[in-house]
Curated annotation (Swiss-Prot):
The keyword Protease does not apply. This is Legumin-like protein Mac i 2. It comes from the Eukaryota. It comes from Macadamia integrifolia (Macadamia nut). Keywords: Allergen, IgE-binding protein, Seed storage protein, Storage protein.
Amino acid sequence: LSTLNTHNLPLLRLVYLEREDLVAVHVDDLNNQANQLDQKLDGGLLPQGHAPHWLMNAHSLFYLTRLLVAQCRAPKGMLVVLPAGVAHWCLNDGKHYLDNPR
């Protein structure tokens, strides 16, 4: 992945690896989704006590991502390897849910 980052790929958001069940996602995208999720939770748009387990798991993932960013262990533009299903939720299904919580 560090080699990929030196090959001028800042606009490439999703990189499929040799293993189909793993993908590389830009840490910037995860960080942006984390901020959106926090705003929805803080604004009371999502029921905190009754949030689905997958939503809380995503929140944990986003929190860890932001922790890595804050500690400069995941610099801007870095690619993070995730299971394909998790990456798909973070960048697609999760965004749809956050935009349409009801």
